[in-house]
Amino acid sequence: MLDLKNLQNNFDEVAKKLKNKKVDENILKKLAELFASLKKEKTALEEFQAFQNKFSKELATAEDKESLKAKLSENKSKINEQSVKVNALENELEEIAHAIPNIPDECVPVGEDEDENVELKKVLNPPSFDFTPKEHFELGESLNWLDFVRGVKISQSRFCVLKNEGALLSRALVNYMIDFNRSHGFEFVNVPFLVNGATMFGTGQLPKFKEDMYKVDDEDLYLISTSEIPVTNLYSGEILASETLPIKMTCYSACFRKEAGSAGRDTRGIIRQHQFEKVELVSITKPEQSDSVFNEMLECASDLLSSLGLAHRHLMLCTGDLGFSAAKTVDLEVWLPGQNKYREISSVSNCRDFQARRAKIRYKNEQGKNELVHTLNGSSLAVGRTLVAIMENYQDKEGKIHIPDALKKYF
């Protein structure tokens, strides 16, 4: 959640940045009106309270006690009425603020959509083939690695069954990713895949993205769309010791997404599924640590791709493509020969204090004051898309898939 004091004190500057993130101008105008109304009503409340405090002290020595009692009683009613007004405005303001995204960092390029993201660099060269490379779903069906028909039969569209070496390769990837991330200083944690609404709110999925979530009927439980949600919230409501920071964690989980806005996109294959697996990096830092830890996380995910021999590129997301909770995001896109283009395989984001304010995660700074931490997250990596990348990059003319050297000991 945004710092409402900063929003109120620097409204024009913040509003300009939020417009670049596609926040409706009418919502920003409504916020400005609410701030003005709240200031007016709070001033009135303070005046009533000041009257009550002053004359309550004088009641014992007042000549006309009954008259003063009546005035104090009337003023108390005004305080109660005014408190209701102030609380209503604060609740309305907070409700709107919950749906407003994070402010983009100064370094984030201004742009409308993914077409205006900025390429930062390429890592490794894509392989060359003396034949036309196939897409992963062709390879997967011919090798009996991917069973789309039975996935749809037991569930619905955008579900798939992994079989034989495809399932084994997926398992090997999970173990390799966890080991790789641990070797880079990230502690492995294993968390529930079902979390409550407060946890979903803490990382910014609720209330804005409620319709995209899978919810358990009659219970305050949601299936997670990323393990960033439970891992970040492990420390919700806590005040951490300064010396424990940064906390760097890695986690494997299944992820569940309705993909409501993806009709017609990636309808074949396992690029976009309702259920998929991911190994995540999550860090909790002091404010002054978050930029360096962001670079560590980005380097970890990029090095992981390089260790598998997968060509990829770094993209800085523009304001129009930036996620709700993120102040800055760099995507890693892996080269897919079958599609002849780069596709997203990881997003590394710095959320600054946006999630920490919602989840109430603080630490005691050197002055002994409680201060909000910064939270960061990133995929290292999306398992299904890494499987796709290996299938397409390591295929041969006969349609067989060769295993990267780094994974051989995991079979």
Curated annotation (Swiss-Prot):
Superkingdom field: Bacteria
Catalyzed reactions: tRNA(Ser) + L-serine + ATP = L-seryl-tRNA(Ser) + AMP + diphosphate + H(+); tRNA(Sec) + L-serine + ATP = L-seryl-tRNA(Sec) + AMP + diphosphate + H(+)
InterPro entries for the chain: aa-tRNA-synt_IIb, aa-tRNA-synth_II, aa-tRNA-synth_II/BPL/LPL, Ser-tRNA-ligase_type_1, Ser-tRNA-synth_1_N, SerRS_1_N_sf, SerRS_core, tRNA-bd_arm
Primary localization: cytoplasm
Localization of this protein: Cytoplasm
Chain sites annotated for binding L-serine: 226-228, 280, 379
CDD domains reported in the protein's UniProt record: SerRS_core (cd00770)
Enzyme Commission number(s): 6.1.1.11
Family annotation (Pfam families): Seryl_tRNA_N, tRNA-synt_2b
Pathway participation: Aminoacyl-tRNA biosynthesis; selenocysteinyl-tRNA(Sec) biosynthesis; L-seryl-tRNA(Sec) from L-serine and tRNA(Sec): step 1/1
One BP annotation, GO: selenocysteine biosynthetic process
Gene3D superfamilies attached to this UniProt entry: Bira Bifunctional Protein, Domain 2, Serine-tRNA synthetase, tRNA binding domain
Binding-site residues, ATP: 257-259, 344-347
Keyword tags: Aminoacyl-tRNA synthetase, ATP-binding, Cytoplasm, Ligase, Nucleotide-binding, Protein biosynthesis
A single GO molecular function term of this UniProt record: ATP binding
Cellular component annotations (GO), alphabetically ordered: cytoplasm
Entry's family note: Belongs to the class-II aminoacyl-tRNA synthetase family. Type-1 seryl-tRNA synthetase subfamily.
Subunit note: Homodimer. The tRNA molecule binds across the dimer.
Entry domain remark: Consists of two distinct domains, a catalytic core and a N-terminal extension that is involved in tRNA binding.
Function: Catalyzes the attachment of serine to tRNA(Ser). Is also able to aminoacylate tRNA(Sec) with serine, to form the misacylated tRNA L-seryl-tRNA(Sec), which will be further converted into selenocysteinyl-tRNA(Sec).
Annotated protein name in UniProt: Serine--tRNA ligase
Gene (UniProt): serS
